[in-house]
Amino acid sequence: MFHHISVMLNETIDYLNVKENGVYIDCTLGGAGHALYLLNQLNDDGRLIAIDQDQTAIDNAKKVLKEHLHKVTFVHSNFRELTQILKDLNIEKVDGIYYDLGVSSPQLDIPERGFSYHHDATLDMRMDQTQELTAYEIVNNWSYEALVKIFYRYGEEKFSKQIARRIEAHREQQPITTTLELVDIIKEGIPAKARRKGGHPAKRVFQALRIAVNDELSAFEDSIEQAIELVKVDGRISVITFHSLEDRLCKQVFQEYEKGPEVPRGLPVIPEAYTPKLKRINRKPITATEEDLDDNNRARSAKLRVAEILK
């Protein structure tokens, strides 16, 4: 069963100022909670383009959204293909785009997918089951230096070197094939005192592997840059992030487009080319309410940022 509790559901969609006949893009369909809430506000002239790289999510969403299928176009693709997706649908601009980043609960809860450090499964972690690169490939075949780099950069793991050394030693004996096998090796690389602090000891390495397998950060950066060009004037973009790397990236991109290019000195009137592309609706990210946290513990790290397109 594909059960998923959407985080900050109302806020994400309400900040889009939904027009009942508008065209919107859900870049991360997942359990379809946000999609359902949005579709309930669209009339029969409105349209939602629902993207997910996980075919299982799309198959499930068709059941969840069964009353609204005439208003939805499902696209099995990576959201970094936004421009091409709209081109294929003969759509030039849309009224709003939203992202709910991170792994959906079902992907974490289905052991076979290999995302969870609580269940034993093969080392997979692919959001798109048709792609070739898996966590098994990275753990067993990438160099010590490459492992250190991704654990540190994507997981902010301070014991990256020690963990990579333990992985190297184990895989010389035999391949590391399962999630719990990897968890035990990670624990060996972290001093006992540090293991007792900061949540599950494997959390940061598993996050790093997931980001590397799915190329998440560069895919998001590619996508958000395209989104800014694809939303109409006065349209909005909502982004929910779940870790500091994504949040920082989102904040930096929004800031860059809000600032606009450097204006040459002495101009009597500022040409439109030098005016900002967007404005941030919230300077500080919106965080989950107590109610959200009661429903879903994963909401604790969620942050929502919203921008409005100005030109």
Swiss-Prot record:
The keyword Methyltransferase applies. Keywords: Cytoplasm, Methyltransferase, rRNA processing, S-adenosyl-L-methionine, Transferase. This is Ribosomal RNA small subunit methyltransferase H. One of its GO terms (molecular function) is rRNA (cytosine-N4-)-methyltransferase activity. The lineage of its organism: Bacteria, Bacillati, Bacillota, Bacilli, Bacillales. The keyword rRNA processing applies. Belongs to the methyltransferase superfamily. RsmH family. It comes from Staphylococcus aureus (strain bovine RF122 / ET3-1). It is an enzyme of class 2 (transferase). Its main location: cytoplasm. Specifically methylates the N4 position of cytidine in position 1402 (C1402) of 16S rRNA. HAMAP family: 16SrRNA_methyltr_H. InterPro entries: RsmH, SAM-dep_MeTrfase_MraW_recog, SAM-dependent_MTases_sf. One of its GO terms (biological process) is rRNA base methylation. It is found in: Cytoplasm. S-adenosyl-L-methionine binds at A32, G33, H34, D52, F79, D100, Q107. Its EC number is 2.1.1.199. One of its GO terms (cellular component) is cytoplasm. It catalyses: cytidine(1402) in 16S rRNA + S-adenosyl-L-methionine = N(4)-methylcytidine(1402) in 16S rRNA + S-adenosyl-L-homocysteine + H(+). It holds the Pfam family Methyltransf_5.
